């Protein structure tokens, strides 16, 4: 874990347990982000919170620190059994749950508190075995948590802290009935520490908060701009004929360390994967059809650097929290302007610089005015020289291939199809309009 401090407030300034401060220090956390600096004084005073904060603002560490500190300060109920968690953290997607659990386990190092994670798509019995041994903090997606509650594997009758992360996404994905089902099986809201975080505090999110929380205090970190100043945006107007060649040329020139390519359909993503794989790139594919185990493996490879380019649909990419993404390519402009913000928000996080490149092709160019109205600025336009685009593109690879393996980037692997195995990239010869 790492983060760039965005406030002058330090974690050491708060009355945190020594075990938590030790874990924070060991993992490079000294200064708080604004959402942490504003929410921790409330939470450490055992008051509920409804926080508005975008992804990448440090909200995960805010609620994890508060949860661990609360459990260390408040004794566990004497009648509690091993199969009765003390805290529950609900996330809309498997990937977000996995990331939260990863950070939670780092914080748990000196506390003696056990962290467990459950989500669909993985072995029911394997996850149950962890629950049978007992966990203090349960992290997971609502559907799998409900499965274990209904089967009597766990009970929520002694929950002392609750976190609902990305509540707006919960509504988008239709999980609100599940959430209310789980809340009804917990102790009264006044006997718990309740935390809700959402990118937007819409009326429906606030209604959920007030129905199941104890007079939560609202904390809002509203960005002045919907897109970060750390992200350099640009847009091209390619013909349908040039579109694939332009993408491959840009990637060859930019040579991104870690890039995500977004497209609007599964079919288009599969086509992109085929051409990128055929061109020698280390590429992964995420669509709704990718099995969960393979999905996790691809994300691990992307995070570790074994894969350089990830091709994804919006649905498949929801909940992804991957650091150090240098480039985002919008092969198709999204139909939903909010998806544009979510897409490019994968880069330029935690104070880092990022690059977002979008294509306004004949099929999706009509989406641009609404996007620019929503983000309240025009996206700078770049031109390209058609004659400078790559013209020696190998045939696309077949979609059914073994998972990518680590390969070197020098001659004989990536770029080996070019004359002499030269890995230098041809100039793009692009110019900007005034």
Curated annotation (Swiss-Prot):
Keywords: ATP-binding, Cytoplasm, Helicase, Hydrolase, Nucleotide-binding, RNA-binding. It comes from the Bacteria. It catalyses: ATP + H2O = ADP + phosphate + H(+). PROSITE patterns: DEAD_ATP_HELICASE, HELICASE_ATP_BIND_1, HELICASE_CTER, Q_MOTIF. It is found in: Cytoplasm. Its EC number is 3.6.4.13. Residues 390-434 are annotated as: Disordered. Coiled coil: none annotated. A motif (DEAD box) lies at residues 165-168. Residues 243-390 form the Helicase C-terminal domain. It holds the Pfam family Helicase_C. PANTHER family: ATP-DEPENDENT RNA HELICASE RHLB, ATP-DEPENDENT RNA HELICASE RHLE-RELATED. DEAD-box RNA helicase involved in RNA degradation. Has RNA-dependent ATPase activity and unwinds double-stranded RNA. This is ATP-dependent RNA helicase RhlB. The gene is rhlB.
């Amino acid at each position: 874990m790492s983060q760039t401090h965005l406030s002058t407030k330090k974690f050491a300034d708060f009355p945190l347990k020594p075990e938590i401060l030790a874990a924070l220090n060991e993992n490079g956390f000294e200064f708080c982000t604004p959402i942490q600096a504003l929410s921790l004084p409330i939470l450490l005073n055992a008051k509920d919170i409804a926080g508005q904060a975008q992804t990448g603002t440090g909200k995960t560490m805010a609620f994890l620190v508060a949860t661990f500190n609360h459990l260390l300060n408040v004794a566990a109920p004497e009648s509690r059994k091993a199969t009765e968690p003390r805290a529950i953290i609900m996330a809309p997607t498997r990937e977000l749950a996995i990331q939260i659990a990863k950070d939670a386990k780092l914080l748990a190092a000196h506390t003696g508190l056990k962290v467990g994670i459950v989500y669909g798509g993985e072995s029911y019995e394997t996850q149950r075995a962890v629950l049978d041994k007992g966990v203090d903090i349960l992290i997971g997606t609502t559907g799998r948590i409900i499965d274990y509650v209904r089967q009597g594997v766990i009970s929520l009758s002694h929950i002392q802290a609750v976190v609902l992360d990305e509540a707006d996404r919960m509504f988008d994905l239709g999980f609100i009935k599940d959430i209310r089902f789980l809340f009804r099986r917990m102790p009264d809201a006044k006997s718990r520490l309740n935390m809700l975080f959402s990118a937007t505090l819409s009326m429906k999110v606030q209604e959920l908060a007030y129905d199941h929380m104890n007079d939560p205090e609202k904390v809002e970190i509203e960005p002045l701009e919907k897109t970060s100043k750390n992200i350099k945006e640009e847009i091209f107007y390619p013909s349908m004929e040039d579109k694939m060649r332009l993408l491959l040329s840009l990637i060859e020139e930019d040579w991104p360390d870690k890039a995500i390519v977004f497209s609007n359909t599964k079919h288009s993503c599969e086509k992109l994967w085929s051409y990128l794989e055929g061109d020698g790139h280390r590429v992964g594919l995420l669509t709704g059809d990718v099995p969960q185990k393979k999905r996790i493996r691809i994300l691990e490879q992307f995070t570790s650097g074994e894969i350089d380019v990830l091709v994804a649909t919006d649905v498949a990419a929801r909940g992804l929290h991957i650091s150090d993404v240098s480039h985002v390519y919008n092969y198709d402009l999204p139909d939903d302007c909010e998806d544009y913000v979510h897409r490019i928000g994968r880069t330029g996080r935690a104070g880092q610089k990022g690059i977002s490149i979008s294509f306004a092709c004949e099929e999706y160019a009509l989406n641009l005015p609404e996007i620019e109205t929503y983000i309240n600025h025009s996206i700078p336009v770049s031109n390209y020289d058609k004659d400078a685009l790559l013209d020696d593109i190998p045939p696309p690879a077949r979609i059914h291939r073994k998972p990518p393996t680590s390969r070197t980037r020098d001659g004989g692997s990536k770029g080996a199809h070019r004359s002499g195995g030269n890995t230098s990239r041809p100039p793009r010869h692009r110019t900007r309009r005034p």
